[in-house]
Amino acid sequence: MTLLRLSLAALLATLTACGSTGTLCGCDDSCGATLTCPETTTPTGPTCPADPDDGAVTADCGIWASATLGDDGNPGTQAAPVRTLQRAVDLAAGGNVYACAETYFDPVTVPAGVSISGGWFCQGGWHRTDKRASLAPAHDVVPLRIVAGGGVSILSDLVIRAADASDPGGSSIAALADVGAAAEFRRVDLTAGNGADGAPGANGGVQPATAGASGAAGFGACSADIGMGGLAPSVQCDDGPSIGGVGGDGSANAAQAGGDGYPDLGAGVGGKGEAAAPVCTGGTNGADGDDGPDGVGALAGGTLTASGFVGVSGADGSPGTRAQGGGGGGASYGKPSCGILPHGGAGGGSGGAGGCGGRAGLGGQGGGASIALVSRSSAVVLRDVRLTAGNGGRGGNGGAGQAGGNGGLPGTGGASYASQPPVGAGCDGGFGGHGGLGGSAGGGAGGPSAAVAHVFGAAPAQDGVEATVGAAGAGGLGGNPGDVAGAGKAGQAVADLEL
């Protein structure tokens, strides 16, 4: 009971207004005597349903939107509706949106708890109609996103269409319920367009990799006190330098061996100088680099993200390795028979540097998906809903590996001197090895066509759902046509896709 404390003036005014009975208006004799009245309850307004099928909707039940009559500067009343559904959702602040059965071209993000009813006629007054509002924005966007919020969104009498994807590997998804969202779809058509083909992977290179530098010639006999061997050539590759072996130096006192090629791959040995053999010997050829392994094709599948779907790309190839430089040639001894000329021997030619390894091809991109509804750990109920998916995109082809660079030519040994006895020539260096072939890449997986795609264990509850799917995308070819393992797998065409 609530005690009414009235001033004398107020009491007299009340008595006067009530006549001369001496009792308060609205009170019986007993409460009038004690100046107390029972506590009253203010009547509440009408219940405002999110779905008009659940009860009567009045003008003050929510925010009203019309693509043709509205303006986003309006308050969102029936007399002054807003133009876009996003503005209506923002103004609703957890309440209801009632949309005229027209086409809306802007995507909308709905916090769970905001509801949208799309079955309204608005030309000359608002009333229910058997037509539905359509949401059909441009390509490469998800028309409807539902994110976590403070309640459950009721989405009724809507037609939602996603356009064909145009970005490489892009997906066409009509609606996406993100992590933590809760929503119920009633009398809704969700239609996805076609997923886009994945982009091909880049080739390692059109031209072969950098060739090894050629070796240098040694000094001729009797041209200097020390006939210098050819200097070591070098080339810088992605995985380090390849260097030809230096040519041996020749003098009256020594005939040096040539240097070994770098990196040490078991070949490219420097030739012997004349002191260690009846005559000098040439350097041996450098070892070739290793070919890079090819990348494998992508398996079918993909990942559901806040942006939609990411397909599986093929594996990149591995680069070829640099080759070894050739060994340097050995030198000859100098002799007094050079006469008045310097008594140096002939220097050996240096080995050619090895060629660089080819760069790898890059994996083909996965094809885009066509999915009517994506559910990412969300609570979704479908009632009287039609789900239609288009075709998945083809996986991109893998890139081809780059050919390895040719090995450098060997330097020639220094010339002999025709004297008696003659001074012998220096020996040639070895050829640089050939760089390894870059590995080719795998093709991307084909994109799926699915009515519903969801994470493990989070399938929507369904009642009266009609699902139609298109064709799955084919897998992309590998960059090496002869490698069967390089082809990507085809996508899946299923009503329910669990990822």
Residue ranges and their predicted role:
Residues 61, 95, 106, 112-114, ...:
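The right-handed parallel beta-helix/beta-solenoid scaffold, focusing on the short coil/turn
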Residues 113, 118, 152-162, 182-194, ...:
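Right-handed parallel beta-helix
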